[in-house]
Amino acid sequence: MILGICDGHNASSSLIKRDEILFAMSEERFTRKKNQRGFPEKSVDYILNKVKPDEINYVSVGGVFRRGERIKKLKEFQNRINKKFLYFYHHISHSYLFKLSDFKEALVISIDGGGDGLSFLASIANKNNLEIIAQSDLIDSVGDFYASITELLGFKPMEDEGKVMSLSSYEGEDDINLTTIDYIKELKSFKNYLGVIGYEATKALKKLIVSDKSQLSFEDKVRISKFAQRTLENIVLKAIDDLSNEYNIDNIVFVGGVAQNVKLNSKIAEKYNLFVPPFMGDEGLCLGASLADKRIDRININNTYFGYEIENERAEKILEELKNKLNDYKIEFVEERDIPEVIGNLILDNKVVCLSRGKMEFGPRALGNRSVIALPTKENKEKINKKLKRSWFMPFAPTILYDFIDDYLINPRYSPFMTQIFKVKENKIKEIEGVIHVDKTTRPQTLKKDSNKTFYGIIRYIYDSIGIPVVLNTSFNLHGEPIVCNEKDAINSFLKADFDALLLGNYLISKVK
């Protein structure tokens, strides 16, 4: 077995046994601090409580360069566990996630803000190996360009880039003609013409594209977001086109934080066979470093349920501890076979239901085990936005039963991890308007039964009742907090958000009418 560790931005840990992922989880879920940095102590302890240290062969670490407290913490853990440690470069760790794809050969593109001195790495994946063919230094970072735009707009860089992407879809001017970063074919590298990154880049961009007003209007933000998104799509596709043509490879594995941009992903998927791992950001480094092991060929995944597991026995104890907070709620145990009907009827009654059961998802998306679900109506979109204190301009995503994607989406593809967007058919827009963005696109989880039988059953029950195989599915967390992890997190977040019902394991907590 290989224990994987990422101790940087969005720290995480994982455990792989031969060709199976046993555990993978982000430290932020345990500490309740978003994008938690540093040694992933709590998630590692969770794993070590499930296996004996003697069963672990070695520890793989994503990322090479570190100093100070990070080195100290890793050394302390190495002394404690007494195992060999292997360190892998940041973008190499990202890139080895190609082993989760079913491509025999692929062009692997890793792009993010930066790690171990690089911000871009292109490789050819063949069998178990990576051959590096192109790279960019930190100063020429595409991810940093987009993060600087995020900061310029008043959002949090390296966290709120999704807001920029969402704003870029709104109606508005798209008239900023400026080349601050580009892909240079002759160099096989991106080139940042600003010559600075971080806050200095934010200041430089502000001087170039913002007038002297103290505050940006919504129209200003849309205009700037369109510039950022257009630039991102153009230069990344330019790089992929160049490398794909040169090496005659049409299979693309896209990793790194920039691969969270689903608009960009869909542009790539229009031209190439695309695989984006569900944990494409730095949280995936722990797994990628472990997958660098030459003895591991491919690992097939059809879900991301690798984290903390909700257990009924523990849920019962927590409910007893918190019973004074639950006087206005009814608590009942629901047999597994009855969950689709019980939860389905609540949804049909236009209730908003929180699901917190089984193993926690790994990666940024909630896919049925730490989700808030409801009918995909505009009314529910507004209701949930208000309760979760989300930005009003951010769209919600749906879960759609895979069997019905052709009825709802234009040119759909299997997308089990919400990594792409698709246009919605005109005759279905009114039916599911709560999960459609202003540009008539949606970012679905296309769900097959073998990925999550009970979640599938809930949506199937709804379809059998009203003919709609779709639910609104958003992550179960309050604004600014990580997705809920354990039983206590789920109850506390449920009570604060004041939703209608919570399915905690097999315990249904619902408001007394």
From Swiss-Prot:
This is Uncharacterized protein MJ1051. It holds the Pfam family Carbam_trans_N. It comes from Methanocaldococcus jannaschii (strain ATCC 43067 / DSM 2661 / JAL-1 / JCM 10045 / NBRC 100440). Signal peptide: none annotated. InterPro entries: ATPase_NBD, Carbam_trans_C, Carbam_trans_C_sf, Carbtransf_dom, NodU/CmcH_Carbamoyltrnsfr. One of its GO terms (molecular function) is transferase activity. Keywords: Transferase. CDD domains: ASKHA_NBD_MJ1051-like_N. GO terms for biological process: biosynthetic process. Belongs to the NodU/CmcH family.
